[in-house]
């Protein structure tokens, strides 16, 4: 085995090793999920050396520099103050969701006006209009990290796959018998998964445009789905109060997570795929062992339905957003609530961490989005200006751009 | 509200929930009517550029009322909201005689929609507080409502501003939902 090169992954922090074995080029990653600004780099490098034979003594200095770079990246943009740079009168009807490509150079908006539009983030210029759906474009996604394709899921029961560069429609995926309300590309960007009000999810082949599998088993609408980091499993969250873990290569049910006593609102894996976090209308969120499907913890405290939940990129923290107008941040290891985000004057329907994991972004029916310190719960900024409730908000991968989409038919770019 | 609540209101409603679609030309008074139903302040109402949704309890039902903007350029999108509609409420500005033909046309097109077939329709002859308002009987005749045979219908004069007649209309709604849901 011969090490060829070392590459960095900023968020979550990791070092990719490209190495040669029997004439074949392979890669593996050293995940540094515990890395934080106070980590003793010297000790960490020693640990890496012990665990990874490819990192020989001669490479140690190089690795030390890389870890320091990763450490610096975790603090990058942490003092960033967001300013409104553009208001885009994007659609003639309310927006649904927004999504950025990995570099943040462009983003997409879906709307009740049946269109998806592609925008240049810097100039605010409209690059493409993706037209063809016959009803609300509800769920949208880029195939990040590549960013050359866009998938749109509509109330017209179809999903369309588009070229992000030309706006050309490659495929229309037909087969669902009710509204498509969630979708995701797998990490390899070979499949699109769609979840529907028809109680099924489907996997589609991007190349051929054919249906690969139908995931049948839920008893009510599927409203959330996500792949794990490797793409080998997918979870679906349903109004039937359960979450199902599926094997994507066979469409077999691996586990059914039973425990919530009301509709599921969100379901996600952490980065290393050891845990699943679910939020529910029953006002609780639950942590599950992804390997055996057992519930590890039930987190109570919210006074109303949980509308969204998420892990940070490394999986060290997770957060919940509630109709009670507050959000909470928990430490994954201890499952203790470390901060409460209080200040919104309406329900919080969206929550996400910045990739560095030290900030949170929330979107609310009070027409504002807010930026919070993840550790102290202090509200750092109120992004004001929308004249109707915010339906969606998102950070870019660098954590220095925020896009908000609203029922007021506009989207706003904050940098 | 949030997108998730919209999805919850989208699915076919359980027995005690009723999905009501509120349509009509711009300036007919749909949003005022919606706010009147929800007992909210009606002093600052601007043209609806999208939609408003409110849930009101009435006679043991939870009425989920969808108020959809009526401007010409967004009327083609009304059909986004047709799915699972239990009752259609069509609102007319009874004082705007110049637009009776236009409103009649839109109503006729709605009644042709497959997804709304057999859905009971209540027509509110709104703005009866205005002196120039045409009476409900005149509107019924002008719009040829008596030719509607594929569903139950009713015309009710009202003033969304004062609230007069609104409850009578909603009583009719509940009565006809009863018939449908049982």
From Swiss-Prot, chain B:
Q: What is this protein called?
A: ADP-ribosylation factor-like protein 3
Top-rank taxon: Eukaryota
One GO term in the molecular function aspect is: metal ion binding
Task performed by this protein: Small GTP-binding protein which cycles between an inactive GDP-bound and an active GTP-bound form, and the rate of cycling is regulated by guanine nucleotide exchange factors (GEF) and GTPase-activating proteins (GAP). Required for normal cytokinesis and cilia signaling. Requires assistance from GTPase-activating proteins (GAPs) like RP2 and PDE6D, in order to cycle between inactive GDP-bound and active GTP-bound forms. Required for targeting proteins to the cilium, including myristoylated NPHP3 and prenylated INPP5E.
Q: Which family does it belong to?
A: Belongs to the small GTPase superfamily. Arf family.
Could you list the residues that carry lipid attachment of the N-myristoyl glycine kind.
2
Chief place of localization: Golgi
Q: Per the record's keyword annotation, is Phosphoprotein included, yes or no?
A: yes
Q: Does the keyword Transport apply?
A: yes
Q: Name one GO cellular component term.
A: cilium
Q: Which residues carry this modification: Phosphoserine?
A: 5
Q: Which gene encodes it?
A: ARL3
Under the heading PANTHER family, the entry gives: ADP-RIBOSYLATION FACTOR-LIKE PROTEIN 2-RELATED
What Pfam families does the database record attribute to this sequence?
A: Arf
What is known about its subunit structure?
Found in a complex with ARL3, RP2 and UNC119 (or UNC119B); RP2 induces hydrolysis of GTP ARL3 in the complex, leading to the release of UNC119 (or UNC119B). Interacts with RP2; interaction is direct and stimulated with the activated GTP-bound form of ARL3. Interacts with SYS1. Interacts with ARL2BP; the GTP-bound form interacts with ARL2BP. Microtubule-associated protein. Does not interact with TBCC. Interacts with RP2. Interacts with PDE6D; the interaction occurs specifically with the GTP-bound form of ARL3.
* Matching InterPro entries: ARL2/3, P-loop_NTPase, Small_GTP-bd, Small_GTPase_ARF/SAR
- Give the organism's phylogenetic lineage: Eukaryota, Metazoa, Chordata, Craniata, Vertebrata
Annotated positions binding GTP: 24-31, 48, 67-71, 126-129, 159-161
Q: One GO BP annotation here?
A: photoreceptor cell development
Residues the entry annotates as binding Mg(2+): 31, 48
Q: How does it sit in the membrane?
A: Peripheral membrane protein
> Which UniProt keywords are present, listed alphabetically?
Cell cycle, Cell division, Cell projection, Cytoplasm, Cytoskeleton, Golgi apparatus, GTP-binding, Lipoprotein, Magnesium, Membrane, Metal-binding, Myristate, Nucleotide-binding, Nucleus, Phosphoprotein, Protein transport, Transport
Gene3D superfamilies tied to this protein:
P-loop containing nucleotide triphosphate hydrolases
Subcellular localization(s) per the UniProt record: Golgi apparatus membrane; Cytoplasm, Cytoskeleton, Spindle; Nucleus; Cytoplasm, Cytoskeleton, Microtubule organizing center, Centrosome
């Amino acid at each position: 085995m011969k090490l060829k090169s070392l590459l960095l992954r900023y968020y979550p922090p990791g070092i990719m090793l490209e190495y040669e074995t029997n004439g074949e080029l392979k890669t593996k990653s050293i995940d540094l999920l515990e890395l934080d600004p106070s980590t003793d780099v010297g000790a960490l490098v020693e640990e890496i050396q012990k665990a990874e034979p490819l990192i020989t003594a001669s490479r140690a200095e190089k690795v030390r520099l890389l870890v320091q770079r990763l450490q610096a990246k975790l603090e990058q943009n942490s003092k960033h103050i967001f300013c409104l740079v553009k208001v885009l009168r994007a659609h003639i009807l309310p927006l649904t969701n927004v999504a950025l490509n990995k570099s943040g150079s462009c983003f997409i908006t879906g709307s009740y006006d049946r269109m998806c539009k592609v925008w240049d983030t810097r100039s605010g210029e409209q690059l493409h209009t993706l037209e063809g759906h016959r009803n609300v474009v509800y769920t949208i996604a880029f195939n990040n990290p590549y960013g050359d394709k866009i998938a749109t899921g509509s109330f017209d029961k179809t999903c369309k796959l588009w070229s992000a560069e030309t706006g050309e429609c490659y495929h229309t995926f037909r087969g669902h018998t009710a509204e498509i309300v969630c979708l995701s590309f797998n990490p390899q960007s070979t499949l699109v998964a769609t979840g529907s009000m028809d109680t099924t999810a489907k996997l589609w082949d991007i190349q051929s445009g054919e249906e690969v599998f139908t995931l049948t088993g839920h008893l009510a609408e599927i409203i959330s789905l996500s792949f794990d980091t490797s793409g080998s499993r997918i979870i679906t969250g349903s109004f039937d109060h359960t979450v199902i873990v599926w094997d994507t290569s066979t469409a077999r049910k691996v586990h059914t997570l039973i425990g919530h006593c009301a509709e599921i609102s969100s379901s996600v894996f952490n980065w290393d795929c050891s845990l699943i976090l679910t939020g529910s209308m029953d006002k609780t969120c639950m942590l599950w062992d992804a390997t055996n499907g057992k519930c590890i913890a039930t987190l109570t405290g919210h006074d109303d339905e949980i509308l969204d939940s998420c892990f940070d990129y490394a999986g060290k923290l997770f957060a919940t957003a509630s109709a009670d107008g507050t959000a909470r941040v928990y430490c994954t290891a201890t499952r203790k609530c470390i901060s409460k985000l209080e200040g919104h004057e309406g329900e919080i329907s969206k929550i996400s961490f910045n990739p560095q994991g030290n900030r949170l972004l929330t979107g609310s029916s009070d027409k504002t989005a807010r930026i919070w310190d993840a550790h102290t719960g202090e509200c750092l900024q109120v992004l004001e200006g929308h004249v109707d409730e915010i339906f969606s908000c998102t950070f870019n991968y660098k954590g220095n751009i925020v896009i908000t989409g609203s029922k007021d038919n506009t989207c706003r770019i904050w940098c | 509200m949030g997108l998730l609540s919209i999805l919850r209101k989208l699915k076919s409603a359980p027995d005690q929930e009723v999905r009501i679609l509120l349509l009509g030309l711009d300036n007919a008074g749909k949003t005022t009517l919606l706010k009147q139903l929800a007992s909210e302040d009606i002093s600052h109402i601007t043209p609806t550029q999208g939609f408003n949704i409110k849930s009101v309890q009435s006679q043991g039902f939870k009425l989920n009322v969808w108020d959809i903007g009526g401007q010409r350029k967004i009327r083609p999108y009304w059909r986004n909201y047709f799915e699972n509609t239990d009752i259609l409420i069509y609102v007319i500005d009874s004082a705007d005689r110049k637009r009776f033909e236009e409103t009649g046309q839109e109503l006729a097109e709605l009644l042709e929609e497959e997804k709304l077939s057999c859905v009971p329709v209540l027509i509110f002859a709104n703005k009866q507080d205005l002196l120039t308002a045409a009476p409900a009987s005149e509107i019924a005749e002008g719009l040829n409502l008596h030719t509607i045979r594929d569903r139950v219908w009713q015309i009710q004069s009202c003033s969304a501003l004062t609230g007069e007649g609104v409850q009578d209309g909603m009583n009719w709604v509940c009565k006809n939902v009863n018939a449908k849901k049982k």
